[in-house]
A protein has these predicted regions:
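Membrane-interface helix/loop caps of multi-pass membrane proteins
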Residues: 2-355, 679
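Extracellular/periplasmic envelope-modification machinery, especially enzymes
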Residues: 2-6, 258, 318-324, 328, ...
Length: 680
């Protein structure tokens, strides 16, 4: 059984050298450049997010090296290790957070400022990964609106820093065998990888953000360090190992994209690539060139600043503007360089001299000061009153939603609370996706007071069409969730075969993808049989429409079926767009033409018309209320009608009460359905 000796006594090949590792510094450039270019939408870097995985491997390697050396020498200090990590990470992070909180006072609307305050506090306490995981969901603010979203990876690394020395110290008390240490870390890595693969399929948000599904990537770096202690390779073999690693990293960047379930098994590709480059321990033109070395030194500050720059461009509506994005990349590099020169380096020098307790007090005090200010911003709801009342009223539309949504609208599992509104007797089912949750209170208000008897069956990203499967399970949950909910909802309807049903949903989203400003997406998010379509074709729309018609007609055999025309989608989040434009003194009007609306929804109308003509279903048309003279406006008298891109807020939904009231009116003599109702 081999024993662990000090590094000087080992046959070490660079991996444990106390000298600066230029290959590691260059590998940092291979990590940060793809991340930045991916976020700024540069073609060819669709999998640039894999750079974060490369960073994780590097961190695991360096931390294992640092701790093992100190344990071998008998001078390891747990508090000293934690302090060294804090000196490396905290100062630049505090500056970024402080700048954002200060600038936000002047520029951010109360809802946005409140969110920034919460995220700042979480970031400075290294809990942002948990916060973003808990926030993740269909109604979550878009990622490009979260100024500190990128700090999730810092939180994961810090949590790893807290745990790794405890694990290694525990192993050192049990055995001095380096092989035993390696086997223990390998076992932990295997468990973490298994959890990662399983959780990516079952709970993708947790797999992406949390430490237990990411630890294996950092442990992989630690295993490389332990393996490299006694490894010897010829120059040719080292060149081959490094080349293979760089190819794997490049392959991950080129082959994967935002649609890829991540991390899962796919993350093995960049992790293995980074591990091989570290194992090779070779200075080459790929990692040793001046550009890679310059970027590598500034990679941490560049990572900290690039995302706020991108969010700023998104905030002012320029995230699809090529010239603005190019300027954003340049600005990120400049800010990263300034941070490295004036924050990172000076803080390291300044915090190297004082006593341990003084350094701890300085770091904790600075972080606590900014975190407490940020928490105050959150507690005060974004400090309302900084803008004109009309601006803040428009911004508040984002939270003008049904207060029962969280309780009655489902986003996981395969059932629903089946909330009953307006009385104790079931009289009407309302079934569909999140657009049901947006209109449900108005459906209830349209009925007899206290006797509407409305049952809500709604699920995130899942319109009621049996047999429909989701192409992107990592976004909305596994296919089985939507299918399971649809099967369950069908049983609920079958148990009451004569009760009327209202079907509603954002069908265009599933057929074409999102509808956003300056971007035209035509990629289905669902399929029905066989292989999913990669683009939205006329044949796919016909198939989708056929399933929609057949679903309605099957229900109409024993009951009255109502189908609501789709709500017009807007090309931007309405409360944010309107409030920001008002605050900046610009025209806040936002709308789509009926031609644009029909371009995405005409096929839905055709399917609904066919169901009306064939099966006597009744169509409820909100566009007669929401659209006038060929234009569907996002506001009414300057007030937003939507809480986001496509969901009506309570104010907007209330305008449709006359439309829904038709469901509660007795049919005319001799009438058997097949009608379209609207109201102006």
């Amino acid at each position: 059984m081999s024993t662990v000796a000090p590094p000087s006594a080992q046959n070490v090949q660079g991996a444990t050298s106390r000298e600066f590792r230029h290959d590691i510094n260059g590998l940092r450039a291979w990590a940060i450049v793809p991340v930045v270019l991916f976020h700024f939408g540069v073609p060819g870097f669709s999998g640039g997010f894999a750079g974060v995985d490369v960073f994780f491997v590097i961190s695991g390697f360096l931390m294992t090296q640092m701790i093992c050396r100190a344990l071998w020498n008998g001078d390891f200090s747990l508090m000293g290790f934690y302090l060294a990590r804090a000196v490396r990470i905290v100062p630049a992070l505090v500056v970024v957070c402080a700048v954002l909180v200060a600038a936000g006072w002047f520029a951010l609307l109360p809802p946005d400022y409140k969110m920034l305050g919460a995220h700042t506090a979480y970031s400075l306490t290294f809990l942002s990964d948990i916060a973003f995981w808990r926030e993740a969901g269909y109604f979550d603010t878009s990622s490009h609106e979260k100024w500190l979203l990128h700090t999730w990876s810092l939180a994961v690394e810090w949590q790893f820093y807290l745990l790794l020395p405890l694990v290694l110290m525990g192993l050192a008390r049990v055995t001095r065998s380096a092989h035993a240490w390696g086997r223990a870390l390998a076992a932990l890595a295997a468990v973490s990888l298994a959890a990662c693969v399983w959780t990516t399929a079952s709970n993708p948000s947790a797999a992406f953000f949390l430490i237990h599904t990411r630890a294996w990537e950092m442990l992989a770096g630690g295993l490389v360090f332990l393996a490299a202690r006694t490894a010897t390779y010829s120059p040719g073999r080292r060149r081959l190992i490094e080349g293979t690693g760089l190819v794997l990293i490049a392959a991950a960047i080129l082959a994967f994209d935002a649609e890829s379930a991540w991390p899962g098994w796919r993350a093995v590709v960049p992790v293995a690539g980074a591990a091989l480059v570290l194992l090779a321990s070779r200075e080459s033109v790929w990692t040793g060139n001046r550009f890679a070395q310059w970027i590598g030194l500034r990679s941490y500050s560049l990572y900290l600043w690039h995302w706020p720059v991108y969010v700023f461009l998104a905030y002012i509506g320029l995230r699809f503007n090529g010239l603005a994005l190019a300027a954003g990349v340049v600005a990120s590099v400049v800010l990263g360089a300034l941070s490295y020169t004036f924050v990172e380096n000076p803080s390291r020098r300044a915090l190297r001299k004082p006593r341990l307790d003084a350094r701890i007090a300085t770091l904790v005090g600075a972080a606590a000061c900014v975190a407490l200010c940020a928490a105050g911003v959150w507690r005060s709801n974004g400090v309302a009153g900084r803008f004109a009342p009309g601006v803040e009223l428009a911004a508040a539309a984002a939270t003008d939603v049904n207060p029962e949504r969280a309780r009655c609208h489902q986003s996981a599992g395969s059932t629903s609370p089946a909330c009953l509104f307006g009385g104790t007797e079931r009289k009407l089912f309302v079934v569909g996706d999140s657009h049901v949750a947006a209109i449900i209170s108005s459906v209830v208000d349209a009925g007899p007071r206290g006797a509407a008897g409305v049952v809500q069956l709604s699920y995130d990203g899942c319109v009621f069409i049996p047999g429909m499967l989701q192409i992107r399970p990592h976004r909305f949950g596994a296919n089985a969730d939507c299918k399971g909910f649809t099967d369950w909802a069908a049983k609920q309807l079958d148990a009451a075969p004569t009760l009327p049903v209202l079907l509603a949903g954002r069908y265009a989203r599933y057929a074409f993808g999102p509808f956003e400003l300056d971007r035209d997406v035509a990629k289905p998010e669902v399929y029905f049989a066989g292989q999913p379509e990669t683009t939205t074709t006329p044949a796919f729309l016909r198939e989708f429409g056929r399933h929609l018609t057949e679903t309605a007609c099957k229900l109409a055999r024993t009951r009255t079926v109502y189908m609501m025309r789709p709500i017009p989608e807007m090309p931007a989040s309405v409360p944010q767009y309107v409030a920001r434009r008002m605050a900046w003194g610009l025209d806040p009007s936002l709308s789509v033409t009926t031609a644009q609306y029909m371009q995405r929804n005409g096929w839905v109308w055709q399917a609904q018309n066919e169901a009306r003509d064939r099966c006597g279903i009744v169509i409820l048309d909100p566009t007669a209320t929401l659209c006038h003279d060929g234009v569907c406006s996002a506001t009414r008298s300057g007030r937003p009608l939507y809480s986001d891109y496509g969901h009506l807020d309570e104010f907007g939904a209330h305008l449709l009460v006359p439309v829904f009231a038709r469901m509660y009116q007795p049919a005319a003599p001799g009438h058997s359905g097949g009608t379209t109702f609207s109201a102006r």
